[in-house]
Protein backbone atom coordinates (compact mmCIF):
# COMPACT_ATOMS: atom_id res chain seq x y z
CA UNK A 1 0.00 0.00 0.00
CA UNK A 2 1.18 3.53 -0.77
CA UNK A 3 1.23 6.00 2.12
CA UNK A 4 1.90 9.73 2.18
CA UNK A 5 4.14 10.59 5.13
CA UNK A 6 3.87 14.25 6.22
CA UNK A 7 6.62 15.32 8.62
CA UNK A 8 6.93 18.62 10.43
CA UNK A 9 10.61 19.52 10.23
CA UNK A 10 12.63 22.18 11.98
CA UNK A 11 16.39 22.59 12.17
CA UNK A 12 16.42 24.20 15.63
CA UNK A 13 14.27 26.09 18.11
CA UNK A 14 15.25 29.36 16.45
CA UNK A 15 14.33 28.34 12.91
CA UNK A 16 10.87 28.11 11.36
CA UNK A 17 9.12 24.78 11.01
CA UNK A 18 7.93 23.46 7.67
CA UNK A 19 6.25 20.39 6.24
CA UNK A 20 7.85 17.81 3.97
CA UNK A 21 6.03 14.93 2.32
CA UNK A 22 7.39 11.53 1.38
CA UNK A 23 5.95 8.44 -0.22
CA UNK A 24 6.19 5.05 1.44
CA UNK A 25 5.16 1.99 -0.55
CA UNK A 26 5.16 -0.92 1.84
CA UNK A 27 3.29 -3.25 4.13
CA UNK A 28 0.46 -1.99 6.28
CA UNK A 29 2.05 -4.06 9.04
CA UNK A 30 5.08 -1.75 9.10
CA UNK A 31 5.55 0.39 12.19
CA UNK A 32 6.09 4.13 11.96
CA UNK A 33 9.64 3.50 13.18
CA UNK A 34 10.19 1.09 10.28
CA UNK A 35 8.93 3.76 7.89
CA UNK A 36 11.35 6.36 9.25
CA UNK A 37 14.25 3.93 9.03
CA UNK A 38 13.34 3.08 5.44
CA UNK A 39 13.11 6.74 4.46
CA UNK A 40 16.50 7.53 5.98
CA UNK A 41 18.06 4.54 4.21
CA UNK A 42 17.37 6.17 0.83
CA UNK A 43 20.44 7.61 -0.87
CA UNK A 44 19.72 10.35 -1.55
CA UNK A 45 16.53 11.05 0.37
CA UNK A 46 14.06 12.97 -1.81
CA UNK A 47 10.72 14.45 -0.86
CA UNK A 48 7.61 14.17 -3.02
CA UNK A 49 8.66 17.27 -4.95
CA UNK A 50 11.91 15.63 -5.98
CA UNK A 51 14.08 17.77 -3.73
CA UNK A 52 17.11 16.16 -2.09
CA UNK A 53 16.70 16.66 1.67
CA UNK A 54 18.64 15.86 4.82
CA UNK A 55 17.88 12.67 6.78
CA UNK A 56 14.99 12.92 9.23
CA UNK A 57 16.13 13.38 12.82
CA UNK A 58 14.30 11.18 15.31
CA UNK A 59 15.18 9.08 18.35
CA UNK A 60 14.97 5.34 18.86
CA UNK A 61 16.70 2.66 20.87
CA UNK A 62 14.95 -0.60 21.71
CA UNK A 63 12.40 -0.64 18.86
CA UNK A 64 10.18 -2.92 20.99
CA UNK A 65 8.25 -0.54 23.30
CA UNK A 66 10.71 -0.79 26.17
CA UNK A 67 12.47 2.60 26.29
CA UNK A 68 10.07 5.38 25.23
CA UNK A 69 12.69 7.19 23.13
CA UNK A 70 10.60 7.26 19.94
CA UNK A 71 7.62 9.15 21.40
CA UNK A 72 6.16 11.65 18.94
CA UNK A 73 2.85 12.96 17.66
CA UNK A 74 1.44 10.52 15.12
CA UNK A 75 -1.72 11.84 13.49
CA UNK A 76 -1.84 14.44 16.29
CA UNK A 77 -1.81 11.83 19.06
CA UNK A 78 1.25 11.07 21.23
CA UNK A 79 2.41 7.53 20.56
CA UNK A 80 5.53 5.42 20.28
CA UNK A 81 6.75 5.07 16.69
CA UNK A 82 7.98 1.52 17.31
CA UNK A 83 4.59 0.21 18.43
CA UNK A 84 2.31 2.21 16.13
CA UNK A 85 1.56 0.18 13.03
CA UNK A 86 0.20 1.64 9.82
CA UNK A 87 -2.85 -0.63 9.76
CA UNK A 88 -3.99 0.87 13.09
CA UNK A 89 -4.09 4.39 11.63
CA UNK A 90 -6.96 5.78 9.56
CA UNK A 91 -6.34 6.64 5.94
CA UNK A 92 -3.21 6.63 3.83
CA UNK A 93 -1.78 9.94 5.06
CA UNK A 94 0.40 9.74 8.17
CA UNK A 95 1.36 12.96 9.96
CA UNK A 96 4.43 13.04 12.21
CA UNK A 97 5.32 15.90 14.55
CA UNK A 98 7.53 16.34 17.62
CA UNK A 99 5.96 16.38 21.08
CA UNK A 100 4.89 19.97 21.74
CA UNK A 101 5.34 20.20 25.52
CA UNK A 102 9.14 19.88 25.40
CA UNK A 103 11.87 22.08 23.86
CA UNK A 104 12.64 21.10 20.29
CA UNK A 105 16.09 19.79 19.38
CA UNK A 106 15.59 19.02 15.69
CA UNK A 107 12.77 17.58 13.56
CA UNK A 108 11.10 14.90 15.71
CA UNK A 109 13.61 15.06 18.58
CA UNK A 110 12.76 16.97 21.75
CA UNK A 111 14.61 17.60 24.99
CA UNK A 112 12.76 15.75 27.77
CA UNK A 113 15.28 16.56 30.49
CA UNK A 114 12.64 18.53 32.45
CA UNK A 115 10.87 15.22 33.06
CA UNK A 116 13.93 13.76 34.75
CA UNK A 117 14.77 16.99 36.58
CA UNK A 118 11.31 16.94 38.14
CA UNK A 119 11.89 13.40 39.39
CA UNK A 120 15.18 14.54 40.94
CA UNK A 121 13.38 17.36 42.76
CA UNK A 122 11.02 14.78 44.26
CA UNK A 123 14.14 13.00 45.58
CA UNK A 124 12.74 9.59 44.69
CA UNK A 125 15.38 7.38 46.27
CA UNK A 126 15.57 5.10 49.28
CA UNK A 127 17.50 6.03 52.40
CA UNK A 128 16.51 2.89 54.27
CA UNK A 129 16.10 -0.78 53.53
CA UNK A 130 13.06 -1.19 51.31
CA UNK A 131 9.88 -2.33 53.00
CA UNK A 132 8.32 -4.96 50.74
CA UNK A 133 4.63 -5.35 51.44
CA UNK A 134 3.36 -8.35 49.44
CA UNK A 135 0.00 -6.64 49.01
CA UNK A 136 1.60 -3.86 46.96
CA UNK A 137 3.76 -6.06 44.73
CA UNK A 138 1.53 -5.76 41.66
CA UNK A 139 1.17 -1.95 41.68
CA UNK A 140 4.90 -1.57 42.46
CA UNK A 141 5.62 -3.73 39.42
CA UNK A 142 3.31 -1.61 37.27
CA UNK A 143 4.97 1.56 38.56
CA UNK A 144 8.40 0.23 37.58
CA UNK A 145 7.22 -0.40 34.00
CA UNK A 146 6.90 3.34 33.25
CA UNK A 147 8.94 4.24 30.16
CA UNK A 148 9.13 7.96 31.02
CA UNK A 149 8.29 8.65 27.38
CA UNK A 150 6.40 11.87 28.12
CA UNK A 151 3.15 10.94 26.35
CA UNK A 152 1.16 11.54 29.54
CA UNK A 153 2.66 15.03 29.89
CA UNK A 154 1.89 15.85 26.26
CA UNK A 155 -1.86 15.47 26.82
CA UNK A 156 -1.97 16.91 30.34
CA UNK A 157 -3.74 20.30 30.43
CA UNK A 158 -1.88 21.23 33.64
CA UNK A 159 1.70 20.46 32.59
CA UNK A 160 4.13 22.96 31.10
CA UNK A 161 7.90 22.73 30.92
CA UNK A 162 8.22 25.98 32.89
CA UNK A 163 5.81 25.06 35.69
CA UNK A 164 6.22 23.28 39.02
CA UNK A 165 3.63 20.59 38.23
CA UNK A 166 5.50 17.38 37.39
CA UNK A 167 2.60 15.40 35.95
CA UNK A 168 1.50 11.79 36.08
CA UNK A 169 4.96 10.41 35.38
CA UNK A 170 6.05 11.74 38.78
CA UNK A 171 3.11 10.25 40.65
CA UNK A 172 3.50 6.88 38.92
CA UNK A 173 7.19 6.66 39.80
CA UNK A 174 6.68 8.03 43.32
CA UNK A 175 4.44 5.13 44.27
CA UNK A 176 7.28 2.66 44.80
CA UNK A 177 9.33 4.93 47.05
CA UNK A 178 6.31 6.11 49.02
CA UNK A 179 5.50 2.49 49.81
CA UNK A 180 9.04 1.20 50.36
CA UNK A 181 10.79 3.96 52.33
CA UNK A 182 10.92 3.37 56.10
CA UNK A 183 12.98 6.40 57.16
CA UNK A 184 10.31 8.84 58.35
CA UNK A 185 12.22 12.10 57.79
CA UNK A 186 13.01 11.28 54.16
CA UNK A 187 9.49 9.99 53.58
CA UNK A 188 8.04 13.24 54.93
CA UNK A 189 10.31 15.23 52.61
CA UNK A 190 9.16 13.21 49.59
CA UNK A 191 5.52 13.60 50.63
CA UNK A 192 5.92 17.38 50.94
CA UNK A 193 7.49 17.66 47.48
CA UNK A 194 4.83 15.33 46.07
CA UNK A 195 2.04 17.56 47.35
CA UNK A 196 3.73 20.62 45.86
CA UNK A 197 4.72 19.12 42.50
CA UNK A 198 1.76 16.85 41.83
CA UNK A 199 -1.21 16.74 44.20
CA UNK A 200 -1.85 20.49 44.35
CA UNK A 201 -1.58 20.91 40.58
CA UNK A 202 -3.50 17.90 39.26
CA UNK A 203 -6.84 18.80 37.69
CA UNK A 204 -7.87 15.12 37.56
CA UNK A 205 -8.66 15.17 33.84
CA UNK A 206 -7.15 11.65 33.67
CA UNK A 207 -6.14 12.17 30.05
CA UNK A 208 -2.86 10.58 31.16
CA UNK A 209 -4.63 7.30 31.90
CA UNK A 210 -6.02 6.86 28.41
CA UNK A 211 -2.85 7.82 26.51
CA UNK A 212 -0.23 5.59 28.18
CA UNK A 213 1.32 3.57 25.31
CA UNK A 214 1.93 0.50 27.47
CA UNK A 215 -1.43 0.61 29.21
CA UNK A 216 -0.28 1.32 32.75
CA UNK A 217 -3.09 1.57 35.35
CA UNK A 218 -2.28 5.26 35.73
CA UNK A 219 -5.45 6.21 37.57
CA UNK A 220 -4.94 3.49 40.17
CA UNK A 221 -1.31 4.51 40.72
CA UNK A 222 -2.29 8.17 41.10
CA UNK A 223 -4.90 7.27 43.70
CA UNK A 224 -2.46 5.07 45.61
CA UNK A 225 0.32 7.66 45.53
CA UNK A 226 -2.07 10.38 46.71
CA UNK A 227 -3.19 8.16 49.58
CA UNK A 228 0.39 7.43 50.65
CA UNK A 229 1.74 10.98 50.34
CA UNK A 230 -1.23 13.02 51.49
CA UNK A 231 -3.09 10.79 53.93
CA UNK A 232 -0.35 8.35 54.93
CA UNK A 233 -2.34 5.31 53.86
What are these regions (language model features)?
Residues 1-22:
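Eukaryote-biased recognition of intrinsically disordered, low-complexity regulatory segments
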Residues 2, 69, 93:
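Broad gene-expression machinery/nucleic-acid interaction feature
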Residues 5, 67-70, 149, 156:
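Short, thiol/selenol-centered motifs that function as redox-active sites or metal-ligating centers
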Residues 6-8, 25, 83, 97-99:
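Residues in well-ordered beta-strands of folded domains
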Residues 19-31:
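Short, contiguous acidic and Ser/Thr-rich linear segments
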Residues 30-51, 92-233:
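Ferredoxin-type iron-sulfur electron-transfer modules in oxidoreductases and energy-metabolism complexes
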Residues 40-75:
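A basic, amphipathic helix-loop patch mediating RNA/tRNA/ribosome contacts
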Residues 72-96:
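Glycine-rich phosphate/adenylate-binding loop and adjacent beta-alpha elements
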